[in-house]
Amino acid sequence: MPAPCNCIETNVCICDTGCSGEGCRCGDACKCSGADCKCSGCKVVCKCSGRCECGKGCTGPSTCKCAPGCSCK
């Protein structure tokens, strides 16, 4: 039986601090919002309010750059 945090084998993306240790492997399809995803290989999704585009190099709320007048979530 695969480790519960091994997203590649379980096809379940776990985006919380509970998956920070051994056996945690997320594939490219694993997308999490916020900076709480401790799983290696997990892609963090940057969301801006309204119809704003997110800047490049976003790894979480602290590095999310949105268009002027837009808030980052």
Swiss-Prot record:
Gene induction: By cadmium.
Binding locations of Cd(2+) 4: C46, C58, C64, C72
Source organism, top-level taxon: Eukaryota
Residue sites binding Cd(2+) 5 per the record: C48, C52, C54, C58
Keywords: Cadmium, Metal-binding, Metal-thiolate cluster
Residues at which Cd(2+) 1 binds: C15, C19, C32, C37
MF-aspect GO terms: metal ion binding
Binding site for Cd(2+) 6: C54, C66, C70, C72
Record-listed Cd(2+) 3 binding positions: C26, C30, C32, C42
Binding positions (Cd(2+) 2): C19, C24, C39, C42
Subunit structure: Monomer.
Function: The metallothioneins are involved in the cellular sequestration of toxic metal ions.
Protein family (similarity comment): Belongs to the metallothionein superfamily. Type 2 family.
Protein name per its UniProtKB record: Metallothionein 10-Ia
Organism of provenance: Mytilus edulis
